[in-house]
Structures are given as structure tokens and as C-alpha cells.
A protein has these predicted regions:
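Cell-envelope and extracellular/periplasmic
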Residues: 2-250
């Protein structure tokens, strides 16, 4: 695929440190979105835009100043609100440099829908390649997904293998065999299978794959999505994981 006509670049800009944001609705962000699918527009200071240091690859593969909601033109079937991406970026920018966020998450998606060859997977990889083409360097994949896979025992049983395959596929297709991947252990979903899913996520043992536990973060009234404040906290936890475990080796 030729991205040469799609990417707006500025050769004077330093190389962007690229972070792929992927998974389902809690990565896309539902913070501040009410039951009537209306976002309250509240942006905490931790999620503030920074026109010099935090950018976003939009749906048209152009860089723009990143601001909430990060996934508004990516996860288009639902109203997006605050997710963890902006608080993460603000927390790492002073150490990591100019940040390029690549939002790819889509609400309500199961891990099998992210298999190589499917639309979601190919879109994620193509967006990541487009970001690199414009002068960026991929630093990590942030992954928050799994609620949809608590629907049945079969889904739970297949999750570990599907997630490990996804990790190996992404690394191979991006040519980054040691790509850091920070996944989030879910805290919502079908209660019957939730704890088993969390055990699976926390137990994935692949080099440069770590897990941040969302346990204790506040859920909205729907008991599925994180509140705005919880998303801010999650972004900070993801940032600490990256800074403490991966920044030096990158």
C-alpha cells in the first residue's frame, strides 16, 4: 500500500514516538458518555491537548494534534469519550519525546475478530505502517480487550491462544520481534468467566509483554466501562509500566 499521498509530514518535526492504542471500548474510551450516548465533553487536565508534543493519526492517515475523544473517527458506531491514551501520552512525553498516538480500538469486538487477515487486524497494521512511513518509530502496543470474550467458556478457553497468536502476528508483520506490548487485565464482563479471563491475561508469558491490572478502577453505572477519572488513572498506570520497563531498552 502506498501511503505517500496520505500522510501530512513536516521534515522539521522530530521523529514521533509511536504508540498503537487497540482493543475494544475501554481503550476507545467511554469516559463521560451517558446512557443516552452523549459525551459530557469534560476533559481532565491530565488529558489536555499539547500542540507541540502529542499527535494523533486520524482516520485519513494524517497527523493532527491529539485531543479527546481520540477514537471519534475510528470507533464510529458508538459515541466515544475519554480513554487512557491522552493521560498516557501526557505522562510519558517529557521522557519519551514527541508522541504519535495511533488509535485502532473498536468497541464490542472479540479477540477472534482481531485475527490476522480480518479487517480490524489489517487496519491496525496498516495504520501502524502509515505512521512509520511518515517518520515515526513504533515504541509499544497498548491493548485493552477481553470483555467480549467472557461470554462463554469456549471463548475463554480460546483466548490465550488467540492473544498469543495476535502478539506474534503483529510483531512479525511490523518487523518488530521484540515490540513491547502492554495489555490491561479487564475488570468487567460476564461475572461467570471474568476471573478466569483475568488469570489468563495476567498469565501470558511472552518476552516484552506485560500486564497492567485495572482492578480497583471505578466503573460507570453500566458496570462495563471505566469512568473518566478511572481512565486517567489507567493511562498513568500504562505510562509507569512503559517508563519503568521499556523506555531504557528503547
Amino acid at each position: 500500500m502506498d501511503f505517500s499521498n496520505s500522510i501530512q509530514t513536516n521534515e522539521a518535526n522530530p521523529t514521533k514516538q509511536i504508540f498503537i492504542l487497540s482493543g475494544q471500548s475501554n481503550m476507545a474510551g467511554r469516559g463521560g458518555v451517558d446512557k443516552n450516548q452523549h459525551w459530557d465533553g469534560v476533559v481532565p487536565p491530565e488529558c489536555a491537548a499539547d500542540s507541540c508534543k502529542i499527535f494523533r493519526l486520524n482516520a485519513h492517515l494524517s497527523w493532527e494534534v491529539a485531543r479527546e475523544p481520540l477514537h471519534h473517527d475510528i470507533d464510529t458506531k458508538k459515541i466515544c469519550g475519554v480513554g487512557p491514551g491522552m493521560s498516557f501520552a501526557n505522562a510519558v512525553k517529557d521522557s519519551a519525546g514527541v508522541i504519535g498516538l495511533v488509535p485502532c480500538a473498536v468497541g464490542g469486538t472479540a479477540i477472534k475478530e482481531w485475527a490476522r487477515g480480518g479487517h480490524l487486524y489489517e487496519n491496525m497494521v496498516n495504520r501502524a505502517r502509515a505512521a512509520v512511513h511518515s517518520g515515526g518509530e513504533i515504541k509499544a502496543l497498548l491493548w485493552y480487550q477481553g470483555e467480549s470474550d467472557t461470554a462463554s467458556q469456549d471463548d475463554v478457553d480460546c483466548y490465550k491462544g488467540n492473544m498469543e497468536t495476535l502478539i506474534h502476528s503483529v510483531r512479525a508483520d511490523l518487523g518488530l520481534p521484540s515490540l513491547p506490548i502492554i495489555q490491561v487485565a479487564i475488570v468487567s464482563g460476564d461475572k461467570k468467566y471474568l476471573e478466569k479471563m483475568r488469570e489468563i491475561q495476567k498469565g501470558i508469558d511472552i518476552p516484552n509483554v506485560v500486564c497492567v491490572d485495572a482492578e480497583g478502577l471505578q466503573l460507570k453505572e453500566d458496570n462495563l466501562h471505566l469512568t473518566t477519572e478511572a481512565q486517567v488513572q489507567l493511562g498513568h498506570s500504562l505510562a509507569q509500566a512503559y517508563l519503568n520497563l521499556f523506555l531504557a531498552q528503547n
